[in-house]
Amino acid sequence: MRTLVVLGDSTSVGIGDPVRGGWRGFGPLLGESFADYRNFSFAGARIGCLRTKQLPSALAARPDAVVVLAGMNDTLRSDFDPSTLHQDLDHVVGALRDIGAAVVTVRFHDHSRVFRLPGTLRRALSDRIAELNAVVDAVVARHGIGCVDLDRLPGAYDLETWSVDRLHPSELGHRRLAAAFAGVLGTPAVSQECVGGVRITPLHHAAWLLVKGVPWLWRRGRDLFPLVVRIMRDARVAEPIRSDRSLPTGLLSDVVEQTAGDR
């Protein structure tokens, strides 16, 4: 295979694996086995962006192999719609297969375990990820493409796999991703030896969570709030009838504690 193309969001951009002048990430690591490597990803991209903004460039490149990694941004938005995601992802993969490209994508891990969200918000995000994975499974089955299950990636839930923000892979995490993609595509193995950057300690993670993590949680939590309310409502309906009809405010307390600092 000669040409590799990467489509996706900030993880595909390489954020979390800094090098002089920018980011590296799994793309260039995997791309070392190809004569030509092109990355059309950009931070904040959703699956719809791949269809409208990245796919045309990918098709023009006539790639032999394509990595498609996006969807997590969709799970964090209030307009999350699995039906639309399926249409967009199916279109992207179908168009790439039509030109003969080998395509590999991912099933997502439960990222709420990495970020350690409070209970009800964790459930909301986990439910969204499960719906996203159902979309991925359907597209993978229809087109017969490769798929890496991030939940089974070695060290998927180890802090060393993640950058200080816990949102993007660290250098080691990107190397693990690249190795998994190489295994599916049948290209040479990717070294797992980290050669740059600063080792991230639990103190780094704690400091980031305090300064930036809580504001991020508040912003994203607002988009997830309708789903949180629905989960609380469903849990309430499932409870045995009690004389005390007060709202289960205790279910919200863990969210409030995590978000109050951003006001």
What are these regions (language model features)?
Residues 1-43, 53-62, 250-251, 255-262:
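Serine-esterase "nucleophile elbow" of acetyl-processing enzymes
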Residues 13-17, 48-86, 110-111:
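Oxyanion-hole/transition-state-stabilizing segment in secreted/luminal serine hydrolases
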Residues 21-22, 80-87, 120-131, 165-172:
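Alpha-helix N-cap and loop-to-helix initiation/capping positions
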Residues 41, 107, 149-152:
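Residue-level recognition of beta-strand->loop/alpha-helix junctions
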Residues 84-87, 91-98, 131-138:
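Alpha-helical scaffolding segments of alpha/beta enzyme cores, especially the outer helices
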Residues 98-103, 145:
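A short helix->loop->beta-strand "cap" motif at the edges of active sites that frequently abuts
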Residues 113-150, 171:
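Substrate-gating cap/lid alpha-helix
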Residues 142, 165-263:
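Conserved catalytic region of serine esterases and O-acyltransferases that act on ester linkages
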